[in-house]
C-alpha cells in the first residue's frame, strides 16, 4: 500500500494543495447560507422536473418484471431463461454505457441537452418495444431504453437546492417502480398487454420534454461557460428571499469550484490515475464503489427484475399483483430512510440492516427448499402452502432493510471523493452500479436453474453478510464533515476509528454552541 500514497510529482503536490486549501478551506463555503432561505415555486418546478426524470428511471427498470411474465409467444416463441436474461440485462448494459457518456459530456454540453437526449432515447426505446415481434427487436428496444436510464441516473437531478431535489430523486425512482407494477397488474389480463406496459414509459418522457423549456441550465453550467450574470439571475429566481450578498456568495462558491477544476486542468486519465495511485483517493473509491457493488449484487435487482417470474414459479396466481407488495415496501421504506439517515448516520444504519438482509435471504433460501420447482423453474405441485408465503415474507423483509440502508445510502457515497477527482469518481460509482446490475440480471435465472433457487438466494445472503463485514472495517461515518475532514479520514487508512472520534468532536462542538446560544437568550 505504500506505493498508493505517493503523488506523481512534487510540483503537482504543491499546486494541488494550494487549490485544495482554496476550495475546502474557503470562508465562502461557511457563509453559503442561501440554501437556508425559502425556495420559490420556480425551484419546485426544477424539483418536479428532476422527479419526472427519476420516475422514468424507476418505471423502466421495474416494468420488465411484468413484461417477462406476459410476453408469452408474442415474439415468435416462448422465451427461455437465457433469452429472458438477455432482454433484461441489456438494459443495464445500455445504462452502463449511457452513464459513461452522460458523465463525460455533462459539463461540455450541459444538463438540459443530456436530459433531452435521455428523453428521446426513452421514447424511441418504448416505440421499438411496442413494435417488436422478435427477440432481436425487443433486445434493441431495451438497449436503447438502457442508454436513457444511464443518462437519467447521471444527470438528474441537478444540484440546486440539495435536500429537496435529492429526496425527490430517491422517492421518484421508487414511485416509478411502484407505478410500473401497478400498470403491469392492470394490463395483466389484456391481450398483448405488455405492449401497453412498454408504451406507458414514453409518457413521462414526453412530459419531461414539455417541462424542460421552463427550466434553466444549472448555475454551475452557466458559470462554466462564463455566463455569470445569467447564473446570478437563476440563483435569484430559485431563492427569491436571498439578498444580493447571499446570491454573490453562492455564485462565488460555484465559481471557486469551477475555476479549481479548470486550473487543475485534470484530464480523464489524470483523474483515473489519481484515484488509483493516491492512497486516500483509492480508499475512498473502494469504500464508495464497494458499497454500491454490494447493494446491487446482494439480490435486490433479481427481485426487482424477476419478481413476477419468481412468484409465478412458487405458485401465486397473480404474480405481478403480488410483486406490487415488494414495490410498495421499497417505496414506504425509502421514506423511512430519508427520515433516519441524517439522524442516525449512514454507517450505523448499514451495520443494522446488512446482516438483516442476509438473514432474510437465508430464510427465503430455506423456504425455497420446501417448494417443488423443476429445473426449468416450473412448479411441480400447487400445494406450496406456507413455503410460498415464507418466500414472499422474506423478500418483503429483505427489501425493507435494503431500502432503509444500502439501496439509498450507496448513492450518497460520492461525497467521499475530493473535488479534483469527484467527477470521475461519481462516474465510476454509477459504473459500479450498472456493471454489478448486468452481472445479476444476466445470471439470476441461470443460477436458479443450475444451483437451485435455495442455492441462488443463499449466495445472495452470503454477499450481504460479506458486505456487512466490509462496512464494519472500511466504511467511515462522515455525517456533518467538511470536504477537508473527509479527506483527512481517508488519509488515516479507511479511517473508521478516526471518523468516530471526529463525530464525537462534532457532537461536543454542537452541544457547546447550543449551550452558548441558550445562555445568550
Positions of PLM-derived features:
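Short intracellular "coupling" helices and adjacent cytoplasmic loop segments at the cytosolic face
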Residues: 237-250
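Cytosol/matrix-facing amphipathic helices and coiled-coil assembly/linker segments
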Residues: 247-260
Amino acid at each position: 500500500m505504500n506505493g498508493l500514497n505517493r503523488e506523481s510529482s512534487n510540483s503537482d503536490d504543491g499546486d494541488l494543495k494550494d487549490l485544495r486549501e482554496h476550495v475546502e478551506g474557503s470562508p465562502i463555503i461557511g457563509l453559503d447560507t442561501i440554501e437556508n432561505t425559502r425556495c420559490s415555486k420556480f425551484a419546485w418546478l426544477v424539483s418536479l422536473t428532476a422527479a419526472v426524470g427519476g420516475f422514468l428511471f424507476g418505471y423502466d427498470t421495474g416494468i420488465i418484471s411484468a413484461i417477462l411474465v406476459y410476453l408469452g409467444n408474442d415474439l415468435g416463441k416462448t422465451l427461455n431463461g437465457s433469452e429472458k436474461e438477455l432482454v433484461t440485462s441489456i438494459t443495464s448494459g445500455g445504462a452502463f454505457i449511457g452513464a459513461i457518456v452522460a458523465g463525460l459530456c455533462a459539463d461540455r454540453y450541459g444538463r438540459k441537452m443530456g436530459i433531452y437526449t435521455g428523453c428521446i432515447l426513452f421514447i424511441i426505446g418504448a416505440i421499438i418495444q411496442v413494435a417488436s415481434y422478435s427477440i432481436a427487436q425487443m433486445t434493441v428496444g431495451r438497449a436503447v431504453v438502457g442508454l436513457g436510464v444511464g443518462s437519467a441516473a447521471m444527470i438528474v437531478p441537478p444540484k440546486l437546492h440539495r435536500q429537496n431535489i435529492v429526496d425527490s430523486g430517491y422517492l421518484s425512482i421508487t414511485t416509478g417502480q411502484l407505478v410500473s407494477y401497478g400498470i403491469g397488474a392492470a394490463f395483466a389480463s389484456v391481450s398483448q398487454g405488455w405492449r401497453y406496459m412498454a408504451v406507458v414509459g414514453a409518457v413521462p418522457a414526453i412530459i419531461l420534454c414539455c417541462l424542460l423549456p421552463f427550466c434553466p441550465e444549472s448555475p454551475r453550467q452557466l458559470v462554466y461557460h462564463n455566463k455569470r450574470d445569467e447564473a446570478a439571475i437563476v440563483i435569484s429566481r430559485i431563492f427569491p428571499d436571498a439578498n444580493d450578498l447571499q446570491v454573490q456568495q453562492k455564485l462565488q462558491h460555484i465559481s471557486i469550484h469551477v475555476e479549481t477544476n479548470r486550473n487543475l486542468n485534470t484530464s480523464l486519465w489524470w483523474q483515473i490515475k489519481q484515484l488509483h495511485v493516491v492512497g486516500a483517493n483509492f480508499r475512498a473509491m473502494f469504500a464508495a464503489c464497494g458499497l454500491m457493488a454490494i447493494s446491487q449484487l446482494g439480490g435486490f435487482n433479481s427481485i426487482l427484475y424477476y419478481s413476477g417470474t419468481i412468484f409465478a414459479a412458487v405458485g401465486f396466481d397473480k404474480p405481478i399483483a403480488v410483486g406490487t407488495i415488494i414495490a410498495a415496501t421499497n417505496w414506504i421504506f425509502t421514506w423511512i430512510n430519508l427520515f433516519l439517515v441524517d439522524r442516525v448516520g449512514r454507517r450505523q444504519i448499514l451495520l443494522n440492516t446488512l446482516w438483516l438482509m442476509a438473514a432474510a435471504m437465508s430464510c427465503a433460501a430455506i423456504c425455497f427448499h420446501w417448494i417443488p420447482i423443476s429445473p426449468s423453474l416450473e412448479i411441480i405441485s400447487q400445494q406450496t402452502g406456507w413455503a410460498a408465503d415464507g418466500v414472499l415474507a422474506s423478500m418483503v423483509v429483505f427489501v425493507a432493510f435494503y431500502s432503509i440502508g444500502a439501496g439509498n445510502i450507496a448513492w450518497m457515497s460520492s461525497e467521499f471523493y475530493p473535488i479534483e477527482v469527484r467527477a470521475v469518481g461519481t462516474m465510476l460509482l454509477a459504473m459500479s452500479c450498472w456493471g454489478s446490475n448486468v452481472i445479476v440480471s444476466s445470471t439470476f435465472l441461470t443460477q436458479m436453474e443450475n444451483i437451485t433457487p435455495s442455492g441462488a438466494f443463499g449466495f445472495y445472503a452470503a454477499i450481504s453478510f460479506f458486505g456487512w463485514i466490509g462496512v464494519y472495517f472500511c466504511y467511515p461515518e462522515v455525517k456533518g464533515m467538511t470536504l477537508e475532514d473527509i479527506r483527512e479520514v481517508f488519509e488515516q487508512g479507511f479511517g473508521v476509528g478516526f471518523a468516530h472520534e471526529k463525530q464525537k468532536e462534532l457532537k461536543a462542538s454542537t452541544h457547546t454552541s447550543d449551550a452558548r446560544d441558550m445562555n445568550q437568550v
